[in-house]
């Protein structure tokens, strides 16, 4: 059985760890009257679920556990294997002893050494009881699927698998977990869950020259490296040491979000398939263990209290980064950086925003984001990728985000964006001729103060003109992003068509009259005096948006 676990891809702004029950611990509660065989299979399903087997061994659109999922590594491409009980292409002919050897030593019945993308160095810590339960579940409960495994595409010398035997000799300890008598039972359990089937270190522990994890536990002189953070496949797996409060970590693993952050990338799938199904006792054990680890020398302290959303920064409308944020980000993340609870994450105090390494932030900005689908949050919210923006624009916006609302992280450079774009090769879907105006370019206008104020009157109409708006609408409620979105009633070129004939009025109307028509009807309010500074500023913004339209 060839496991090629996608642990290296399953990371985002926060943590990834999965549960495996201690041999001395009872399995999850089962229905009254269950037979021993049923109890074993239920426990096996739980172990498989908490080990996130589905995420790695089920290709997109593929059969359950039938493999075929692509995993790109620095050495080449490998594919997850078929772990259904099919006797020809799966694991249907494996004895328990053969299965156990694969899981602990990474060696198949045919003597083939597996690549350590399959985290057998961690699985070696599993108890025999849990290993037998997992074996029983895979062979008796998972439907057999006949699907031939795909060959790995690894370059020389990594395609010489005999070298993996030496790697195993140097770095793999195949002995089960041993509790530390100096630790409490909950901490021992948490350590067992994190270090064993959870294989949290596969993503969150730094790697050495031979691509080995620098530590497999927090013990010994190398223990300071354990879970200290690593960059994997253009994602930054943050340090898990001394993580938040126990309650906050439990909430994140259960729901995909807490008051500090929201998971991203493939971690959303991990939450969906795996960690939301953990028992509360197991989640608490994991969180307690992570909290007990002393922070690393480069770790920023995890906040114990969520940041209170601040007012919009003073430079929101006076810098290119601030205006870029206003145009492309503020609708969801709000001018105060507070986001929308349960939907869009806060940016103030968010560890993924303030991390010294901006890898994940760049990844999300270029390719997009989605929330985890969980029982607590069944609706998935998404963020589009912004690869259509130029590298310097993205750098300006992210630098603004990383230094606003109390955030104090280094700025982002265009060179960093360029490098990430080359690595990800993100695809854009904009095939129209519409060119989105950039609000940041307002600052280059001869009348910059006037047109920026005009833009704000469209964006913050209710707040800035309370005597003229009778409901809660802003101009941008209908004309998205201050009239800059292609399919959101844009303002581009509009002023060139005024004065124009209005059938409703039966006469030619000016742009000022058309604006006041919105105040009267759409906003149930009062018109602006045509010669007022506010009206002149709104018209100036329309004139700036005319662009090249004649």
Per-region residue spans from a language model:
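Extended non-catalytic domains of envelope/secretory-pathway proteins
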Residues: 38, 191, 202, 208, ...
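Sequence/structural segment immediately N-terminal to covalent heme-attachment motifs in c-type
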Residues: 37-58, 64-72, 168, 178-208, ...
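Bacterial N-terminal signal peptides that target proteins for export
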Residues: 1-9
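Boundary at the C-terminal end of the N-terminal hydrophobic targeting segment
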Residues: 21-23
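Hydrophobic, ordered structural segments
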Residues: 97, 101-116, 120-193, 197, ...
């Amino acid at each position: 059985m060839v496991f090629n676990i996608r642990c290296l891809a399953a990371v985002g702004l926060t943590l990834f760890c999965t549960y495996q029950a201690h041999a001395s611990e009872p399995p999850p509660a089962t229905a009254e009257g269950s037979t021993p065989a049923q109890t074993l299979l239920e426990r096996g399903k739980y172990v498989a679920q908490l080990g996130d087997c589905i995420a790695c061994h089920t290709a997109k659109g593929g059969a359950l556990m039938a493999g075929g999922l692509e995993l790109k590594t620095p050495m080449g491409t490998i594919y997850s294997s078929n772990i259904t009980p099919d006797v020809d292409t799966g694991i249907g002919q494996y004895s328990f002893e053969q299965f156990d050897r694969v899981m602990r030593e990474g060696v198949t019945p045919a003597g083939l050494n597996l690549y350590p993308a399959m985290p057998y160095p961690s699985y070696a810590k599993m108890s025999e009881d849990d290993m037998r339960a997992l074996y029983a579940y895979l062979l008796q409960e998972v439907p057999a699927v006949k699907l031939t495994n795909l060959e790995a595409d690894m370059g020389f010398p990594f395609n010489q698998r005999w070298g993996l035997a030496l790697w195993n000799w140097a770095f793999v300890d195949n002995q089960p977990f041993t509790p530390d008598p100096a630790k409490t039972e909950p901490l021992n359990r948490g350590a067992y869950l994190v270090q064993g089937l959870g294989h949290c270190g596969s993503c969150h522990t730094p790697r050495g020259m031979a691509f080995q994890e620098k530590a497999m536990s927090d013990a010994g002189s190398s223990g300071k490296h354990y879970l200290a953070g690593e960059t994997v496949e253009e994602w930054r797996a943050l340090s898990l040491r001394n993580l938040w409060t126990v309650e906050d970590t439990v909430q994140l693993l259960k729901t995909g979000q807490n008051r500090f952050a929201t998971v991203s990338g493939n971690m959303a799938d991990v939450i969906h398939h795996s960690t939301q199904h953990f028992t509360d006792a197991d989640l608490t054990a994991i969180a307690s263990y992570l909290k007990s680890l002393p922070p690393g020398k480069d770790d920023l302290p995890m906040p114990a209290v969520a940041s209170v959303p601040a007012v919009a920064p003073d430079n929101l409308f006076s810098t290119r980064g601030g205006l870029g944020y206003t145009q492309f980000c503020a609708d969801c993340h709000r001018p105060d950086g507070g986001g929308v609870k349960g939907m869009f994450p806060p940016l103030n105090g968010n560890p993924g925003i303030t991390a010294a390494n901006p890898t994940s932030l760049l990844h999300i900005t270029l390719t997009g984001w989605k929330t985890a689908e969980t029982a607590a949050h069944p609706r998935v919210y998404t963020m589009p990728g912004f690869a259509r923006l130029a590298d310097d624009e993205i750098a300006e916006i992210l630098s603004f985000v990383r230094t606003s609302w109390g955030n104090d992280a280094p700025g982002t450079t265009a060179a960093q964006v360029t490098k990430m774009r080359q690595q990800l090769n993100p695809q854009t879907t904009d095939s129209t001729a519409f060119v989105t105006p950039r609000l940041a370019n307002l600052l280059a206008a001869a009348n910059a103060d006037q047109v920026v104020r005009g833009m704000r009157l469209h964006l913050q109409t209710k707040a800035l003109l309370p005597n003229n708006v009778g409901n809660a609408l802003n101009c941008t409620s209908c004309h998205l992003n201050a009239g800059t979105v292609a399919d959101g009633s844009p303002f581009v070129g509009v002023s060139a068509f005024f004065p124009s004939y209005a059938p409703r009025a039966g006469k030619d109307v000016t742009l000022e009259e058309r604006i006041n028509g919105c105040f009267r009807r759409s906003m149930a309010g009062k018109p602006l005096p045509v010669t007022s500074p506010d009206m002149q500023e709104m018209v100036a913004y329309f004139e700036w948006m005319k662009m090249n339209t004649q």
